[in-house]
């Protein structure tokens, strides 16, 4: 049988050769099978919520616009996308070694005596060479599989960056809203304090008040001005953070007060399975890395066995270019080669040990990712009900303080209490309004964190 007929058979045999990689088994999840959920507000099944993209989750159109802009311009996401392209090219490069390599060549030479008393000698040649490594033990196949899994892991890493960017832009936007709302409350409070100061000043002129009350009124005005300056700085910082995430420094949307209806609340079944975590991109990335480590063990094991390569070629040579392709000028060659590892001072065993240890490290990393993901979801679920309870209590407290302030002002006007009682009520009301804003912002951030932790985005 000629080499040309042997080569396709060898290629087919090598491509279907055995693999020495261990059979892959997904590690057991080192977390409970279900999350502990209260029944409050968790009644609607949400089997498809992971497929509900951020355009569905975020109701606020301004948020959607900002996220769309960030997905186009953000440098972190752009870098992650380039890494995916690099990993894809690396996989193609490694996979190419599994297939025959075919190269053509041609050359011509002219030679003669320097004295010019002999005729010029000419020589022309062409050739076609093929080479192929018979991958009987799966070394190249496993190396290719490892690169494929690395490429898939990079894709999941890019998806994780995408989800994180969506989350960060939304949180930054709501932080801007919070800073603006706190500034608005501080400015409103300053106006109220200034009105109180004017009232106390009039009472001082009529003898119904004293200098101490006037100084107290002036003191809270200056304190509130200081708070306004602080809130202005926080708003500027929030704008800077948002612009960095957007990847551009164009005009930001006008800040608005916090809207509690900016998000579509995540509805969860009472018996939420922890299996849902397996769809998170960071966990899928870790699993692909584990599969790559598994394939590397197969490549390391194959190094203990012989490697066989085939080289074949056809060529022609002639002193006359016109007769270069005559049948009489053609030649062929077929060169099989086998390399058998005999002694390498333990190099192959060390490579296998490294591959096995890295596979064990990948298992630990995979389990850690699952445990961290479980904690993120469990924390968000626990905080969810706590924040709702805190907000309800704070709203009742705010209503009580508003009544207290009204009564304190009425009593002060009739001389029944000192101005200090009014100041205490105003300070408490101001602080409670700020706290309620903080709690509403925390609830929004927690909803975003829960949505992200469950793999949404």
UniProtKB/Swiss-Prot annotation:
It is found in: Cell outer membrane. One of its GO terms (biological process) is response to copper ion. One of its GO terms (cellular component) is cell outer membrane. InterPro entries: OMF (IPR050737), OMP_efflux (IPR003423), RND_efflux_OM_lipoprot_NodT (IPR010131). Its main location: membrane. A lipid is attached at residue 18 (S-diacylglycerol cysteine). A lipid is attached at residue 18 (N-palmitoyl cysteine). Changing residue 273 to P: In strain: K1 / RS218. GO terms for molecular function: copper ion binding; copper ion transmembrane transporter activity; diacylglycerol binding; efflux transmembrane transporter activity; identical protein binding; porin activity; transmembrane transporter activity. Changing residue 191 to G: In strain: K1 / RS218. It holds the Pfam family OEP. It comes from the Bacteria. Residues 1-17 form the signal peptide. Induction: Transcriptionally regulated by CusR in response to copper and silver ions. Changing residue 33 to H: In strain: K1 / RS218. Keywords: Cell outer membrane, Ion transport, Lipoprotein, Membrane, Palmitate, Porin, Signal, Transmembrane, Transmembrane beta strand, Transport. Changing residue 6 to I: In strain: K1 / RS218. It is a multi-pass membrane protein; Lipid-anchor. The cus system plays an important role in copper tolerance under anaerobic growth and, under extreme copper stress, in aerobic growth. PANTHER family: CATION EFFLUX SYSTEM PROTEIN CUSC (PTHR30203:SF32), OUTER MEMBRANE CATION EFFLUX PROTEIN (PTHR30203). Belongs to the outer membrane factor (OMF) (TC 1.B.17) family. Homotrimer. Component of the cus efflux system composed of CusA, CusB, CusC and CusF. Forms pores that allow passive diffusion of cations across the outer membrane. Part of a cation efflux system that mediates resistance to copper and silver. In pathogenic strains it allows the bacteria to invade brain microvascular endothelial cells (BMEC) thus allowing it to cross the blood-brain barrier and cause neonatal meningitis. This is Cation efflux system protein CusC. It comes from Escherichia coli (strain K12). The gene is cusC.
């Amino acid at each position: 049988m000629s080499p040309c007929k042997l080569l396709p058979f060898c290629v087919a045999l090598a491509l279907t050769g055995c693999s020495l990689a261990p059979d892959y088994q997904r590690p057991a999840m080192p977390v409970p099978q279900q999350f502990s959920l209260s029944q409050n507000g968790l009644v609607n099944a949400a089997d498809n919520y992971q497929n509900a993209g951020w355009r569905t989750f975020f109701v606020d159109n301004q948020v959607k616009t900002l996220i769309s802009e960030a997905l186009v311009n953000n440098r972190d996401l752009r870098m992650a996308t380039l890494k995916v392209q690099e990993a894809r090219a690396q996989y193609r490069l490694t996979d190419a070694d599994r297939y025959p390599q075919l190269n053509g060549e041609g050359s011509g030479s002219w030679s003669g005596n320097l004295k010019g008393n002999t005729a010029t000698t000419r020589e022309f040649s062409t050739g076609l060479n093929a080479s192929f490594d018979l991958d009987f033990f799966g070394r190249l196949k496993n190396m290719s599989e490892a690169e494929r899994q690395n490429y898939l892991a990079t894709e999941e890493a890019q998806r994780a960056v995408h989800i994180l960017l969506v989350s960060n832009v939304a949180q930054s936007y709501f932080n801007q809203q919070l800073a603006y709302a706190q500034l608005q409350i501080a400015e409103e409070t300053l106006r109220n304090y200034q009105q109180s100061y004017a009232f106390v000043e009039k009472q001082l002129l009529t003898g119904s008040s004293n200098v101490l009350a006037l100084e107290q009124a002036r003191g809270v005005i200056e304190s509130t001005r200081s708070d306004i300056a602080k809130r202005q700085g926080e708003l500027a910082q929030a704008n800077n953070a948002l612009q960095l995430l957007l990847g551009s420094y164009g005009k930001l949307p006008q800040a608005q007060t916090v809207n509690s209806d900016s998000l579509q609340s995540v509805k969860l079944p009472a018996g939420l399975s922890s299996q849902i975590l397996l769809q998170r991109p960071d966990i899928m990335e870790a699993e692909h890395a584990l599969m790559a480590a598994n394939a590397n063990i197969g490549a390391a094991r194959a190094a203990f066995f012989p490697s066989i390569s085939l080289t074949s070629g056809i060529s022609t040579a002639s002193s006359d270019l016109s007769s270069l392709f005559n049948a009489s000028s053609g030649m062929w060659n077929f060169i099989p080669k086998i390399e058998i590892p005999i002694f390498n001072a333990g190099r192959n065993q060390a490579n296998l040990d490294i591959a096995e240890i890295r596979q064990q490290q990948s298992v630990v990393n995979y389990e850690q990712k699952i445990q961290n993901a479980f904690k993120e979801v469990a924390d968000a679920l626990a905080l969810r009900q706590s924040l709702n309870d805190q907000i309800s209590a704070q709203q009742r407290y705010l209503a009580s303080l508003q009544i207290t302030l009204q009564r304190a002002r009425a009593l002060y006007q009739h001389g029944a209490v000192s101005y200090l009682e009014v100041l205490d009520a105003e300070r408490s009301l101001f602080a409670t309004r700020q706290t309620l804003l903080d709690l509403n912002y925390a609830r929004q951030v927690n909803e975003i964190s829960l949505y992200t932790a469950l793999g949404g985005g």
